[in-house]
A protein has these predicted regions:
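N-terminal, membrane-interfacial amphipathic/helix-forming hydrophobic leader that caps
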Residues: 1-101, 110, 242-287
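Hydrophobic alpha-helical transmembrane segments
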Residues: 21-26, 77, 110-118, 157, ...
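Hydrophobic alpha-helical transmembrane segments of multipass integral membrane proteins
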Residues: 30, 34, 78, 82, ...
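Transmembrane alpha-helix boundary/anchor motif
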Residues: 32, 36, 40, 121, ...
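Functionally important transmembrane alpha-helices
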Residues: 32-40, 197, 201-202, 208-266
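Juxtamembrane helix-loop-helix connectors linking adjacent transmembrane helices
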Residues: 51-57, 64-69, 98-167, 181, ...
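Hydrophobic core segments of transmembrane alpha-helices in multi-pass, intramembrane catalytic enzymes
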Residues: 79-83, 159-163, 212-217, 268-272
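Membrane-interface helix/loop boundary segments of multi-pass membrane proteins
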Residues: 170-195, 222-229
Length: 287
């Protein structure tokens, strides 16, 4: 039997949570504070020369940023573990289980998972080509490229664990899990999809990243709403992030071939739409 969408199941009504606004704020603070604390610890461990006399404030700031940039995926990996531990503690405080609190134990069907993987790969290629095709202001593009390049640190195992596994898991637990459910206590499920996407986009470091992350958050929120499960969202997000490495290879070999790029752009849009339609079809309640 197909999964029933949230608005028909009435999940938020059957599993009420107290103070949804407070819960959303705590979740956002948990993620930001964990990253801040880990970043500070990394700087302390790797920035011994910061304490040398004669260094100006500007030089110290630049060195701190360089250290955080070089260890970005380590920061994401460690702070992700802390965030998950924080969610586990929040569940205990609310006298719930981790699975029930985050929604990760809600099952889904294998075809939906396969479609989510396909959608993640297609969305990665389509979104990246679309971003490159739009004439954004140069400063906006430079800040985006600088921030995104920090996710490739020359430590492939750590980069993979952080970008492809930890980040999708943590962000889905937070935004399509706890925060989405909390929003459903306040607004209809469709509006909750939009609001969680806005919050998701706001956590990214540059304006261009915020814009496209917000749009991706809408798609992930739609999948969450339709499937009533986090697993399609986690797999889709993981495939999206992992495909960025595949796109780098594609861009290196075919980036100058406009006909190939155009074909991949159209094909990825078709696969994305077809996959989302398949997810919608597979999660429509049968008469």
């Amino acid at each position: 039997m197909a999964e029933e969408p949230d608005e028909k199941r009435g999940v938020s009504m059957k599993e009420p949570r107290k103070n949804p606004f407070f819960l959303i704020i705590v979740c956002m603070m948990l993620m930001m504070l964990s990253q801040t604390v880990v970043s500070f610890a990394i700087v302390l461990l790797n920035g011994g020369s910061l304490f040398q006399s004669g260094m100006t404030m500007e030089q110290a700031d630049a060195m701190m940023l360089d250290i955080m940039f070089a260890h970005q995926t380590e920061i994401l990996l460690i702070s992700g573990v802390i965030t998950i531990a924080g969610l586990w503690l929040m569940a205990k405080v609310r006298k719930s289980t981790f699975g029930a609190f985050t929604g990760i134990t809600k099952p889904t069907k294998v075809p939906v998972l396969v479609l989510a993987l396909a959608a993640g790969v297609a969305m990665s290629f389509w979104a990246t080509i679309a971003i490159n095709a739009i004439p954004w202001p140069e400063a906006m593009v430079e800040s985006y490229v600088e921030s995104s390049s920090a996710l490739t640190t020359g430590k492939p195992v750590i980069d993979f664990l952080a970008v492809v596994l930890m980040v999708p898991l943590v962000e889905e637990l937070l935004f399509r899990g706890v925060i989405y459910d909390a929003l459903c206590m306040i607004v209809p499920a469709g509006a909750a999809v939009i609001f969680q996407a806005m919050l998701f986009g706001s956590t990214h470091s540059t304006m261009l990243w915020m814009l496209y992350s917000g749009l991706i958050g809408c798609v992930l929120g739609y999948v969450r709403k339709r499937s009533n499960s986090l697993w399609p969202c986690i797999l889709m997000h993981s495939a999206f992030n992992g495909s960025s490495y595949l796109f780098n290879w594609f861009s290196e070999h075919y980036g100058e071939d406009s006909s190939t790029v155009t074909f991949v752009f159209i094909a990825s849009a078709f696969v994305l739409l077809l996959s989302l339609y398949g997810i919608s079809f597979r999660t429509t309640p049968k008469e």
